[in-house]
Structure formats: structure tokens, C-alpha cells
């Protein structure tokens, strides 16, 4: 049986980490693509030379021509520029929209049957644009946000409670940004909701609120520490979890930026919600009930996504 093929568009820090993780988890053969010739080839060779030590047989290649992604089963997109100091949101959108247009055309021509995971920011707008530009079915194009945001929340909670991260579940919905919605009512330690743990004296509401806020600002915290870049280990791990659920038909329930067609009262947008990922891509959207506060937070988050989409449509009339 042929190995799966994973195409990574963008061979920067996240792309290289994705390539290494795909090998370690034996998900398939990997092609790294980047417009800067030499970088994907160099990283591919470096990782291939680590394979004898780690004991995996995946084939690695690098390319700067989209024909190399032909027939990919999974495509993970990290191409684009990060937001730099002094750059406005619209500047970032304008640059990365052009990138998504080129990437979308490449996927449409060479890997139209792939499951596509977008990581490029601003995420909720870029995954929406990528689906439009590629013309792929909405269930085969998703954005990586919620898995990462939930992982950050789980890390903070596990540290606070002094328990294993394995026993902490966290629920983060909405857009990937300051308006994300960490739902404490649906987040648990060994099945016990966080709201109950506050009542039991394990933590205080103030500490819980601080962890929620730290989760919202999680990406920025790392940017401020690194000074020359942004997070790449946790984002790569998060995207690999999504790819693995698709390739192995695990049907994991993962929070992702998924296309909504009426669910949660949202139509035609990509918003972070829990979904089942299996061999058919996004197979189901899980709808949870909100209380009034959660509903207001979610609607605010959706409003922010709508603003990003409007900005995209103002920049590129093909998206209008």
C-alpha cells in the first residue's frame, strides 16, 4: 500500500517542524514547498538524514514548483508573512491574500482531492479566502486555531492544578484572536468542570479569568519573548493532530476553524467550533448551547471575523 503524501506549503519554522513531526509519527512521505529555492530542499535533506537515527522511512523532497505537490493527500499551508511591528491588519491581509491566491491556484491544479489545513494569519480570513481561491469543498478546507488555543489553555490549567495535561480538556471557540471564546463551563479536569473546581476551592474565579486572558494573548506572549518570530512548535503539533485524524480516520473531536452553513446561527463563514475530522474531512459540526454571556462573546467573535472578511473583499474583488 502506498504511503500517504503530505505537502507543506511554506518551509519556514512551522513548515520544518511539521515535516519532522510527520516523519516521527509516520504519517507519510513529505514534500516541502517554498518560493525561496534551496530552503525546502535543505530542510528536506536535513530531516531525511535524521530518519535513520529516529527509525522512520518517509521520503522527503523539497521544491519551489507547485507541480511537486501533485496528488497530495494532505496539504498544510503556512506560507505568508507574520505581522511585524508597525504593520496594520489590512497590510497583513493584503500581502497574505496574494499568497493565498497563488497557493489556492496551485492546490486547485495539482492537489484538488487533498484535505487542506491553513495556518496562515489572520487565520479566519485566510482559510475562507483559500477555500474560495482553491474551489475545494468546504469540508476539505479547515483552519488550525482551536487545537492550539485549547492546548495553551490546557497547559495553563494543568500548571495551576498540578495535574497531567492528559486529564485536562479545554474548549476554545470563535475566531483566532483576542475575541476567541474559552468556555470554562465545558472545560474539565478528569471530567469535573472548571466551574465546579472553583467551588471546590482548587482555584479562584480571578485566577481562572487570568488564565482565560492569557490564552487569548498566548500567541502575542511568545512573539514578545522571541522578538524575531512567532510560535512554531505548538502550532505544528496542532496541525499534525488534525492531519493524523484525517489520514487515519480517527474521527477525533477537535476545535477548528470550519465552514458554517447555519450552525451556531452563522452562514458562509469560517469560525472556530468543535468538529469531527475523519476520512471525509470535516464530517460533523458539534453545536453546544451557550448561556447569555457565552452567546455574547461568540457573537462578538463572529463579528470580528466578518470584519476580516469585509477587509478581504475590499482588497480583492474576486472574493466579493
Curated annotation (Swiss-Prot):
Family: Belongs to the LDH/MDH superfamily. MDH type 3 family.
Catalytic residues in the record: 176
Keywords recorded for this protein, A-Z: NAD, Oxidoreductase, Tricarboxylic acid cycle
CDD domains hit by this protein: LDH-like_MDH (cd01339)
EC number(s) recorded for this UniProt protein: 1.1.1.37
Protein role: Catalyzes the reversible oxidation of malate to oxaloacetate.
NCBIfam families noted in UniProt: MalateDH_bact, PRK06223.1
Binding positions for substrate per the UniProt entry: 83, 89, 121, 152
Name of this protein: Malate dehydrogenase
GO biological process, one term: lactate metabolic process
SUPFAM superfamilies, alphabetized: LDH C-terminal domain-like (SSF56327), NAD(P)-binding Rossmann-fold domains (SSF51735)
Any GO MF annotation of the entry: L-lactate dehydrogenase activity
Residues making up the signal peptide according to the UniProt record: none
Native source species: Methylorubrum populi (strain ATCC BAA-705 / NCIMB 13946 / BJ001) (Methylobacterium populi)
Catalytic activity: (S)-malate + NAD(+) = oxaloacetate + NADH + H(+)
Residues that hold NAD(+) according to the record: 10-15, 34, 96, 119-121
